[in-house]
Amino acid sequence: FRMRGHEEASGTKYVPQELLDRWAAKDPLENYVEFLRNEQLLSEEDEVLIKKEIIHEIDENLKMAFDESEVESIGSNELNDVYKKFVYQEVSPNSELRNIRLVDAISEGLKQSMEKHDGLVIMGQDIADYGGVFKITDGFVEAFGKERVRNTPICESAVVSAAMGLSIKGMKAVVEMQFADFVSTGFNPVVNYLAKSHYRWNEKADVVIRMPCGGDVGAGPFHSQTNEAWFTKTPGLKVVYPAFPYDAKGLLATAINDPNPVLFFEHKALYRNIYQDVPTSYYTLPFGKAALLKEGDDITIVSYGAGVHWAMNTLKDHPEINADLIDLRTLMPLDTEAIYG
């Protein structure tokens, strides 16, 4: 029971005095003190001493706060505090290649990161024995056990919050949204817990949220959204959206290494339709570096995800169009130099 509002502007005039009196009699602090007295565990002298120590601690810390210089908000300082510092370390791939699909590249990259990071936990609906609806984690339980590959209830807000808790304990977490649409029920912990944790209290949010998204697979309006725009303007989040298997594997490794929260979008229509030669070893790719897929003088096309393939098909059907084609790969950070250059 709340005896007063949670902040200065919240009043209690609407609460009957009788109700306040009834709950005041149940005050656990007062009752605990009375219990200690009755058990002869707390003398009057001890009580006075404890209260003096508490008041002294409060006064000392208040003085420290009041003696500090006035806070000056400087734009550069504010922006520098949005993300936890991350020093990207490039890991080059080996020369052995395998022609695989986008879905295979994501699965392979996730598995290799599980092997690299003992403290990495994957969570999501039906991802354990069943292997997830897209089978990306198929066989992971046998390889890593159910403590690290965890089925979750249908409660996205709880799953994202649990991932944040793992990060605070020094672990890493990858959350699979069964479909990107479902992130709406976990929106608050994504944009208010994960995104703001470093800016507010210097705490990392070492969480990757995998987001199977997009239409063209007959999944209907509640399983086909491409909702990356919800997050690209939320300070503290990073947003990745690869179009090719090679990029997906390397960018996923970087996302898991990054101590900041990353939303990793995967267009479902590309899962089993796009093939590419991909290195078999573990490797990383940097965020914020777009790929120039085609050079031309007439027009510049900037896209990401499935849009890259739509552009490639259009240019193939219209050879008279001489265009630059830029694949952004990451939307936050955004490679503005590639766009405007």
Enumerate the predicted regions with their spans.
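Short helix-loop-beta junction
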Residues: 139-146, 230-233, 310-326
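Glycine/aspartate-rich loop-and-adjacent alpha/beta segment that forms the canonical ThDP
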Residues: 1-92, 273-289
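Short glycine/threonine-rich loop-to-helix capping motif typified by GTGT followed
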Residues: 5-12, 134-138, 334-341
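Hydrophobic alpha-helical scaffolding
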Residues: 18-25, 36, 40, 44, ...
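A beta-strand-loop signature enriched in Asp, Gly, Thr, and Trp
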Residues: 13, 313-341
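Glycine-rich beta-alpha junction loops
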Residues: 1-3, 54, 213-215, 266-271, ...
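Glycine-/acidic-rich phosphate or pyrophosphate-binding loops and their flanking alpha/beta elements
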Residues: 105-113, 249-261, 270-317, 337-341
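Thiamine diphosphate
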Residues: 77-265, 269-270
